[in-house]
């Protein structure tokens, strides 16, 4: 009986814990950074097509839309699953050295302050896991099976 009481008390405390996390100033800052940084443009399915009118509960869960160019075909990572695999310290270290294929602006992530990297991490973790992993990268000689945005070849010099 005592175990049931303890479990019930813990379950009642969870909403309060979640609310506290939502009020964390870094969570709020992270949400702001996601919005102004354009993260949703690629990492949230149909975000640009819907003029940004996608429920926040669907944000950053990746997309099956491919981005194809001379590098091959890339897909926006499901950040909500990706961040579940990293500690905050691992993300900060990775964010400072991140390199990725186009069109990911990895150089902008590298330019972020440590505080902003922490804020981004806490916001995405606050959203919780959702969705499924994005399709894997395809080299230039492999044809994607789904829709893609095609980038032109760069001009010859």
What residue ranges belong to the model's regions?
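Short, cysteine/histidine-rich loop/knuckle motifs that typically chelate Zn2+
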Residues: 41
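Hydrophobic h-region of N-terminal signal peptides that target proteins for export
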Residues: 9-18
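A structural feature that tracks compact, well-ordered secondary-structure segments
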Residues: 80-84, 93-95, 106-108
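Local sequence-structure signature of Cys/Sec-based thiol-disulfide redox active-site neighborhoods
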Residues: 29-37
């Amino acid at each position: 009986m005592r175990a049931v009481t303890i479990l019930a008390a813990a379950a009642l405390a969870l909403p309060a814990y979640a609310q506290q996390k939502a009020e964390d100033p870094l969570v709020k800052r992270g949400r702001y950074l996601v919005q102004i940084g354009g993260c949703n443009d690629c990492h949230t399915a149909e975000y640009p097509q819907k003029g940004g009118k996608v429920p926040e509960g669907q944000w950053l869960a990746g997309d099956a839309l491919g981005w194809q160019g001379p590098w091959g075909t890339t897909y926006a990572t499901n950040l909500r699953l990706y961040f579940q695999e990293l500690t905050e310290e691992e993300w900060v270290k990775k964010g400072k050295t991140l390199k990725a294929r186009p069109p990911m602006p990895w150089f902008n992530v590298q330019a972020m302050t440590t505080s902003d990297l922490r804020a981004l991490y806490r916001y995405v973790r606050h959203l919780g896991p959702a969705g499924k992993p994005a399709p894997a990268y395809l080299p230039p000689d492999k044809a994607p099976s789904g829709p893609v945005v095609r980038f032109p070849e760069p001009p010859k010099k």
